């Protein structure tokens, strides 16, 4: 007869501490985890920009000017946007009520997201192991156990990736996901009040609204935990009520149609295809976790991490086989359980010899992962102060376009710019003619992109260029050739010329 564990009983058994070497190893892991978290806190101060940070800054810009009708974050158009999530709405309220710059608000968001992530990992790991030392190696595995090739992508928790995305909604959502899994794991193990299940449903919807791809990962993890626990019928009924409430929240969210996103995947496949490339180089160290999952499966065929991994791997593989490459964003649903399993195997019950071998192999793998991501130090230490071999791994962040604001570009001005500048300019309040990122709700995105291409094309005549500028109400142009209707205002980094459009 199977007896469900109590609310505080971990899923897996743990080994008792054994000697000074074991204590030293635990202390070393805790110190290393503390140092990594400290490094990330210092990164928040610098807040390096090399990705989608401008998209989120632009979202806060629109919300601080109009909480009810913010419009498109990137272009001057009245469209909904999936970036207007409850979390970004709260940040918009903070920006509007305090007059803080959007980049200060993003630093506050980074602190909140990092805090949620660290505490969420601790809480969830405690549902898997009662060993006091378990959370520290688990956090290190999530950040360092990746591969010999550097990989940065929103929604993936590698150290260097997290340093560049710590202010993103994906980190906030991932932190909520770990808390969601911890809360759900305890709920399915015993008698839980209706209010708890309804709260879980609302939290599930919040994660999906804040970052849809991380919401998929959270959903797969939640499903794995329910399947592993085999809850009683009463618990399933309450779970169903929570799901219905979550769906209701998704349906009622006024800033965008959540369910319309299911038909928008075709526009995202090309940019997600790289997720299926260089898998061994990017994620090779995770194979250690796959081996650990094998041990866990041998001990318990319904182990939640094993089920979680299988669901994530299934969705990822289905995306690659069917050409739905955006499904690759579900890969963390396979990576996270494998990384956690690798860490937990060090403290799991079992033969002492196996555990001791694992305690040697895991630190070695973490050291390889740390070396791959050593360039993260460059985000808090000047490159010249780094050892040469570390400095070579550092990737210089983007400069930004603050210089345009100093030159006179104001909130709401429309700027003609190519794709790369268009990914940053809206962060300062201006619009661009075409969005720098795919926008599933902007119906004329293709037409706008074609207009930008025509404007900067060598064979386009003066009359057509002027017509494009008039059509989109352009007041500024970045780059391109001088013209009689343009007045050069300043030259920014990299020789980028800013022109004012003359009447």
Please name every model-derived segment:
Residues 376-503:
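Extracytoplasmic
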Residues 134-137, 193-196, 235-240, 297-311, ...:
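Membrane-interfacial loop-to-transmembrane alpha-helix junctions, especially the N-terminal start
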Residues 244, 349-376:
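Signature aromatic-anchored transmembrane alpha helix within multi-pass, membrane-resident enzymes
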Residues 217, 324-362:
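Hydrophobic/aromatic-rich transmembrane helices and adjacent perimembrane loops
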């Amino acid at each position: 007869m199977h007896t469900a564990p109590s609310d505080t009983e971990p899923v897996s058994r743990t080994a008792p501490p054994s000697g000074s070497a074991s204590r030293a190893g635990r202390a070393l892991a805790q110190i290393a985890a503390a140092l990594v978290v400290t490094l990330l806190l210092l990164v928040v101060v610098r807040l390096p920009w090399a990705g989608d940070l401008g998209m989120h800054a632009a979202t806060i810009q629109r919300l601080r000017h109009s909480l009810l009708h913010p419009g498109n974050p990137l272009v001057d158009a009245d469209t909904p946007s999936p970036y207007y999530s409850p979390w970004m709405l709260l940040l918009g309220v903070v920006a509007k009520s305090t007059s803080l710059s959007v980049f200060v608000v993003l630093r506050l968001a980074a602190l909140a997201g990092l805090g949620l992530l660290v505490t969420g990992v601790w809480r969830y790991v405690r549902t898997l192991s009662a060993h006091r030392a378990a959370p520290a190696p688990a956090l290190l595995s999530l950040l360092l156990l990746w591969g010999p090739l550097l990989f940065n992508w929103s929604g993936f928790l590698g150290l260097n990736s997290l340093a560049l995305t710590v202010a993103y909604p994906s980190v906030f959502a991932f932190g909520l996901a770990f808390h969601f899994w911890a809360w759900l794991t305890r709920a399915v193990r015993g008698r839980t009040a209706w209010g708890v299940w309804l709260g879980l449903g609302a939290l599930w919807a919040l994660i999906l609204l804040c970052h849809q791809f991380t919401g998929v990962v959270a959903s797969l993890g939640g499903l794995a935990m329910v399947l592993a626990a085999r809850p009683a019928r009463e618990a399933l009924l309450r779970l169903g009520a929570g799901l219905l409430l979550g769906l209701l929240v998704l349906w009622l969210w006024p800033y965008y149609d959540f369910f319309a996103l299911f038909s928008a995947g075709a526009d995202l496949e090309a940019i997600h295809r790289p997720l299926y490339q260089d898998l061994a180089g990017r994620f090779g160290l995770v194979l250690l976790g796959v081996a650990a999952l094998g041990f866990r499966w041998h001990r318990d065929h319904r182990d939640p991490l094993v089920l979680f991994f299988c669901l994530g791997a299934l969705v990822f593989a289905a995306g690659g086989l069917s050409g739905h490459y955006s499904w690759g964003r579900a890969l963390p649903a396979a990576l996270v359980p494998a990384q956690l399993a690798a860490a937990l195997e060090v403290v799991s019950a079992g033969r002492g010899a196996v555990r001791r071998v694992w305690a040697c192999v895991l630190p070695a793998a973490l050291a390889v992962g740390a070396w791959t991501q050593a360039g993260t130090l460059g985000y808090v230490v000047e490159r010249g102060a780094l050892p040469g071999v570390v400095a070579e791994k550092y990737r210089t962040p983007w400069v930004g376009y603050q210089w345009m604001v100093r030159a006179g570009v104001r909130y709401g001005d429309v700027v003609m710019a190519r794709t790369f500048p268009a990914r940053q300019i809206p962060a300062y309040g201006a619009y661009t003619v075409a969005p720098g990122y795919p926008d599933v709700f902007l119906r004329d995105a293709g037409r706008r992109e074609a207009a930008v291409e025509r404007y900067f094309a060598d064979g386009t005549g003066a009359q057509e260029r002027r017509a494009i500028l008039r059509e989109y109400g352009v007041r500024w142009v970045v780059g391109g050739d001088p013209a009689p209707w343009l007045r050069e205002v300043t030259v920014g980094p990299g020789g980028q010329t800013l022109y004012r459009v003359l009447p």
